[in-house]
Amino acid sequence: MKTLSKLQQLSFIIRREFLAISTSYAVLLVLMGGIFVYGLLYNYMYAPNIVTDVPVAVVDNSHSELSRDFIRWLDATPQAEISSQAMDYHEAKEWMKEGKVQGILYLPHDFEERVFRGDEAVFSLYATTDAFLYFEALQGASSRVMLAINDKYRPDEAVFLPPQGLLAVAMAKPINVEGTALYNYTEGYGSYLIPAVMMIIIFQTLLMVIGMVTGEEYSSKGIRAYTPLGYGWGVAIRIVAGKTSVYCALYAIFAFFLLGLLPHFFSIPNIGNGLYIVLLLIPYLMATSFLGLAASRYFTDSEAPLLMIAFFSVGLIFLSGVSYPMELMPWYWKVVHYIFPAALGTLAFVKLNSMGASMADIRPEYITLWIQALIYFTISIWVYKKK
């Protein structure tokens, strides 16, 4: 009978949590908007992954052989297409405002003269940042052309070197460098960004939902509904376990949509073992849920979590080690990396999903996620015991 009573209490907590979520329009909006709209929007925005033939206007004030080579080689790159030549920068700027071009190449009058004098040549490339892929494409294309121009004219610059420098250049053996992308074979921005962002979306929206539900409980005194269950540690454990089971069940479905269906529809790298990803998501969702419940004592209303959590995405991408290598992080950022489940979970997921890693390859992240789950579980029990 005592066991049955505990199961009845757990069932009551689960039903009440589902009811709190399903009857709150704000929570449903975060779930529908954050998971489905946010997830679809990110994938749709970066669906091209890489862009080609970005229209560029040229302002050539040099009218030299070198400037013509630069323009011709830029046009030969797959990323850029020279659509027209403007009389001056103001005309090209108007074309950009009208949407006729996405970038402007400006070559000053002394472009060739500076090279032949042994100085650094200067050119300017303006690109729109309203679509980041255009900016990235033009930046990459211009960098490659600049290196090609440098290789072509470097022998002519030997006359500007001192004798010892000339001897060093003559004795140097050229090295041909060929780069091969091991995982992101298209070198597309979407292939690099989307897998990490999907994990961050799961973390952020889950914390928002927990914060909004517990904030509403605090402001409406809804926590008193658990008073008849008692005040012991066992009741606190059942409250935390019941709430967490609801969130994990919901986000198991959402994770399947974000990490399973969307990569298939938008051709995002998805070479990971499905079982390994499921094994990773278990401690990831549990640690995130326990973290939200542990922090619930600071959520005094349902609006505060939106303001506190919504702006963490860029920082979490950085902390994960995906956009910036862990080896180069200062020690204090490495400490923060091990505090948030999003950082560890995102790095582990990218290894599994985009790099085809095994569970042995993500062992440090996986073990740390379970440790986080245990620590935050203990803290959340203490928080609900105090409540």
Where are these regions (language model features)?
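Loop-to-transmembrane-helix entry motif
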Residues: 17, 21-28, 201, 242-248, ...
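Junction motif at the cytosolic side of a transmembrane helix
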Residues: 15, 21, 213-228, 368-387
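Short helix-terminus and kink motifs of transmembrane alpha helices
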Residues: 105, 140, 208-216, 289-297, ...
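Membrane-spanning alpha-helical segments of multipass transporters and channels
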Residues: 42, 63, 249, 260, ...
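Hydrophobic alpha-helical transmembrane segments of multi-pass membrane transport proteins
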Residues: 40, 180-262
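Extracytoplasmic/periplasmic domains immediately adjacent to an N-terminal transmembrane anchor
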Residues: 1-189
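Cytoplasmic juxtamembrane interface segments
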Residues: 119-137, 212, 292-314
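Alpha-helical membrane-protein architecture signal
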Residues: 7, 11-15, 191, 232-245, ...
